[in-house]
């Protein structure tokens, strides 16, 4: 927390998962139904997630949220594994963090119990049924509906974490775009801007207590799509146009 003239309520870190087999654009006909609809990280994606975890190994989070899709939970796990003693100890799975149209309706998604067997460090966000599925189907939703979903997630977090709390949200490129717009008060139907979230890119947004932000603005974009944790191993990543 800073001085009384500039009081931080929440530091929000919006993060995209590591590279997946789906990101490579290759045919996945030989994959199982689960692996086609709920893709896993590639070896490179796993390494990206590990480097992400190292980035925050001395940076305690009050909470780490993840979507209920495996690629996000895999990535969030690498953050949790490397948190300092005073950092977050589990991953909070929030079903509304699912990717925009990220799964087919024929795929019902994992139950919490199934996911817990794969990722023992998860818990379920307050207000959701442990016996239910942990993803949301949003294929065909309008931008306005997707933005409303992002606003629900943001409201959930901001109502629970205050007084300088640090929260990481590990989700997906398209959904993170709506979360980004929601956090900054932007209308995606009017603003032509693609944040272009890359794998394990980190975006930091700070919310100030009302009336205490610089220039009387209570939200600040500190940095967007930061990949500095990958530069040592992937010096050209993010320099040339790329989509994963």
Language model features: what each stretch is:
Residues 119-145:
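Short glycine/proline- and acidic residue-enriched helix-loop micro-motifs
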Residues 7, 50-127, 195:
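Phosphate-coordination/substrate-recognition cap region in phosphate-metabolizing enzymes
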Residues 11-15, 65, 165-171, 175:
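Beta-strand elements within well-structured catalytic alpha/beta cores of enzymes
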Residues 55, 78-82, 156, 182-186, ...:
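Active-site catalytic microenvironments for nucleophilic, acid-base chemistry
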Residues 1-62, 77-81, 85, 211-244:
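An N-terminal RHG(E/S)-centered segment typical of histidine phosphatases
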Residues 1-11, 99-121, 163-165, 181-244:
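Acidic, low-complexity terminal tails and accessory targeting/binding regions
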Residues 58-60, 157-165:
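Glycine-rich phosphate-binding loop signature in dinucleotide/nucleotide-binding domains
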């Amino acid at each position: 927390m800073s001085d009384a003239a500039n009081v931080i309520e929440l530091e929000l870190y919006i993060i995209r998962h590591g590279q997946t087999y789906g990101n490579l654009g290759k045919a996945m006909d030989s994959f199982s139904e689960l692996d086609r609809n709920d893709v896993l990280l590639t070896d490179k994606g796993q390494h990206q997630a590990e480097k992400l975890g190292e980035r925050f190994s001395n940076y305690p989070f009050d909470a780490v949220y993840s979507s209920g899709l495996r690629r996000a939970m895999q990535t969030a796990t690498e953050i949790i594994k490397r948190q300092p003693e005073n950092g977050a100890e589990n991953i909070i799975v929030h079903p509304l963090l699912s990717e925009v149209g990220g799964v087919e309706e024929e795929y019902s998604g994992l139950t919490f119990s199934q996911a817990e067997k794969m990722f023992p460090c998860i818990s379920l966000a307050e207000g959701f049924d442990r016996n239910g599925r942990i993803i949301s189907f949003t294929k065909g939703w309008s931008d306005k509906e997707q933005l409303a979903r992002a606003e629900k997630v943001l409201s959930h977090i901001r109502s629970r974490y205050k007084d300088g709390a640090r929260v990481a949200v590990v989700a997906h490129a398209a959904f993170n775009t709506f979360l980004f717009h929601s956090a900054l008060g932007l209308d995606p139907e009017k603003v032509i801007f693609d944040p272009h979230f890359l794998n394990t890119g980190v975006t930091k947004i700070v919310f100030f207590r009302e009336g205490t932000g610089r220039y009387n603005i209570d939200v600040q974009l500190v940095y967007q799509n930061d990949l500095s944790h990958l530069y040592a191993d992937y010096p050209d990543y993010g320099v040339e146009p790329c989509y994963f």
